[in-house]
Amino acid sequence: MAVDTLWERAKYINGATFSPDGKQLMVFGSGNAFDNIGLNIKEGQISNTYDGQLFLYDPATRKAKALTKDFNPNVTSAQWNKFDGQIYMLTEDQDYQRVYTCNPANGKIRRLDLPEDVIYNYSLAEAAPVMYYYGQSVSNANRLYSYNTKSKKTQLIYDLSADKLKDIQ
């Protein structure tokens, strides 16, 4: 196996992970990464380098593609699911933290219909259509759920809110 430098002193790139097949990289950074290909601002505006964006990078061609250039929420983290090939993104949009999927083949982004306003974290199974996540909303504390990524069904696993708020009327 040979070692190759893909970037040197790459400004605005925060990290990267391999695709499930090992042929591409999912790159985290600001819209300024890769010579500004992720920017979606008017001329004369200054970019927000804290606005998290996702890119696909092909090491063979050394070409990058902006996945979330026209996507409004800020991407805070993402995971490329081995089971279904989708990229699952945790996002921030004002007071909400939601999970979206991105199809890396066509760039189509879809919000998961999850019952909480603030999703704190999630974990994906490698060999099954299962995601566990926890979050809360304005009227409840943390709850843990299971989500079937194929059927799109959510199941409440544990309601910490019931314990925390049991004496509140």
PLM ranges: what are they?
Residues 1, 15, 110-169:
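Non-catalytic accessory segments flanking enzyme active sites
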Residues 58-62, 103-107, 148-152:
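Short loop/turn segments that connect beta-strands within beta-propeller blades
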Residues 1, 58-62, 77-80, 84:
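Extended amphipathic secondary-structure runs
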Residues 18, 80-82, 124-126:
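Residue-level recognition of a conserved intra-blade site in WD40 beta-propeller repeats
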Residues 1, 6-14, 27-55, 66-76, ...:
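A flexible loop/linker signature enriched in serine peptidases of the S9 family
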